[in-house]
From Swiss-Prot:
Pathway: Glycan metabolism; plant cellulose biosynthesis. This is Putative cellulose synthase A catalytic subunit 11 [UDP-forming]. GO terms for biological process: cell wall organization; cellulose biosynthetic process; plant-type primary cell wall biogenesis. The gene is CESA11. It is a multi-pass membrane protein.
Amino acid sequence: MDGESPEIMPVECPDPEPASSESGDDHDIPEPLSSRLSVPSGELNLYRAAVALRLVLLAAFFRYRVTRPVADAHALWVTSVACELWLAASWLIAQLPKLSPANRVTYLDRLASRYEKGGEASRLAGVDVFVAAADAAREPPLATANTVLSVLAADYPAGGVACYVHDDGADMLVFESLFEAAGFARRWIPFCRRHGVEPRAPELYFARGVDYLRDRAAPSFVKDRRAMKREYEEFKVRMNHLAARARKVPEEGWIMSDGTPWPGNNSRDHPAMIQVLLGHPGDRDVDGGELPRLFYVSREKRPGFRHHGKAGAMNALLRVSAVLTNGAYVLNLDCDHCVNNSSALREAMCFMMDPVAGNRTCFVQFALRDSGGGDSVFFDIEMKCLDGIQGPVYVGSGCCFSRKALYGFEPAAAADDGDDMDTAADWRRMCCFGRGKRMNAMRRSMSAVPLLDSEDDSDEQEEEEAAGRRRRLRAYRAALERHFGQSPAFIASAFEEQGRRRGGDGGSPDATVAPARSLLKEAIHVVSCAFEERTRWGKEIGWMYGGGVATGFRMHARGWSSAYCSPARPAFRRYARASPADVLAGASRRAVAAMGILLSRRHSPVWAGRRLGLLQRLGYVARASYPLASLPLTVYCALPAVCLLTGKSTFPSDVSYYDGVLLILLLFSVAASVALELRWSRVPLRAWWRDEKLWMVTATSASLAAVFQGILSACTGIDVAFSTETAASPPKRPAAGNDDGEEEAALASEITMRWTNLLVAPTSVVVANLAGVVAAVAYGVDHGYYQSWGALGAKLALAGWVVAHLQGFLRGLLAPRDRAPPTIAVLWSVVFVSVASLLWVHAASFSAPTAAPTTEQPIL
């Protein structure tokens, strides 16, 4: 290491503070800052009874299906029964963790009275906010600027907030837009604090159609709002000018204002960059108030090094923030997720700083909303149900982490089990690393053993003791560097944070000062591309490499619990509604990540996770294996079309009275369980139906492709990336100094697939079912087989169920728009359906014996 790097200083863990209460009586137990409430027993018991009835009827239904084969369509019958069994097993795995839902309540007034007493400095813990910006070409810089402004204007002590924006593409446009946002923040933040406006993303705030004059707003507020809106319009003009200029990339690359080339002209080969935008000494807003800190970060990238995408960027920010600000908690956001509730950070602190459960809470996952109200079923049903067990899963954004949990430590209850162990025993436990207990043993050893060399004493015995301490010190340092990396400043901050967190209140934020030059140099070092080599980053500490769900899974496996927070006003909201291409691309990425976790040797919930309960494990298995259900679902959606076009059936033609009653009761139990689930979750029926249609579209497209991509990636190491462009586009900017050979080598392990390719399967399914419905009805009317309308009605009902789920997708596919619909997807679908039908007729003409006409004549 460089000689100017900071030395590791001795770290002493302070004794825990005595518990205090709001009344001031030391003997009183402090009031909790949050509580978990169960769903009313009447609603929950009815829901459980409906699920149990559905399970019993499913067992009877499968007994009927297995014992009543269809002789003239044996292959179709076997296929349909196999699909039904597969889908039923998937439903059961996902249903069992959903039997104990819970609701959370936070007490912001108690948080304020405990940590923000009048006349005293705020003792709320420091929070480092990470904003991930991946590609400025797809993510408008105005969206990133709004996200940053909403974070900086949050209702939280300014000295306790530090915002880090990671630019994974090293784009000069992102840097310039953040520079403009930092200047606008000096006026926007005091405006929000003076008037308490919501939301605090200026684009979302000024887009609200509210008549403030009708509400008799104060004249000063109306005047300030008009002036601020005028300034924001000017800010948008400057941002749009930057975006327009960025489309014309100079041949020699971008040049900064001082005449030097932009270091990130080559997005795949550039040095690390860190710039302090807010937080210099004397930085004040227009009202003279303190400003939060804002940093621009772009990690180093070199050919030949794996960068691990978003997880690698988050780990880089975790190390940089530890060196510069070292907040006790970390909140990560995507660049298009704005803070919609200014009290979001306080809501998170109600869980993290809770005197009862705070030491066992690894992260708080917030609900993520958009203007269309999507994902209501996932957040308001599935996440609440997991919250009743060990906690919700991590979904990749809108999550507040404990830094201690990210570093691989175990919760306080597990960490305090063996505090009487000596130093030698500690070393024996931590020599191999990879376990939370070894990390906690190291923490105790670090607090017990000074980290600076002791001076030799005259006494021989003291010299021997000093020599032994130095040997142990070298061993500890080597072990720490193998685990965390070769950065004394980062290692010291890791154990400093633990001592501060164990003090009881999570520590108080330091004053806003500009980082020393030596700290910035160390921060540059910890984001170098070679820093993680031969360390445990991405395997045991930080964000796990292999999928976002794996990060929360590893924490739960160590014994931590998590919390789900969904305040009345959503904490975070998407800047703009996602396009269909972005929806499919996002669904594809999540499904591929889920398959990667399921097939992982380290993070698979099927066998990993020593401290997971059965229901929590089933919740993770359901979350990781959901793409597999796309295989039977796609086949089952195609079966009605096959039956209508061939005159075959997957059910026996003679249905007894008992069989009919069983089928009716099964359908009733399905409807009852869904209705009761919507009742206790308060999810509107319209939102549920929208989620069902989206589930069908993504299951037959993105999830179906993800199954093969996951298997391909696990077997060959080839990753498949999806592009939201319908045609090949030129590179974003020139890669100076990188010839074609190096570029091909960088892309050798990645296959790019356009999003329109995902539309072939759902388009084929809906076209085949529509063709089957039209052909079957026309054939029945033309030939007068009215006695067969009963059997035909069942087939039409199944085909109608498929078409009803995909009709929104079909309307969107054929709707008029600025550009033509993806013709290639429609053509491939029609060709696929036609070829499949002809092959069936060709095979049936040689295999089926000649028979007299019946009411079940093949239509083709």
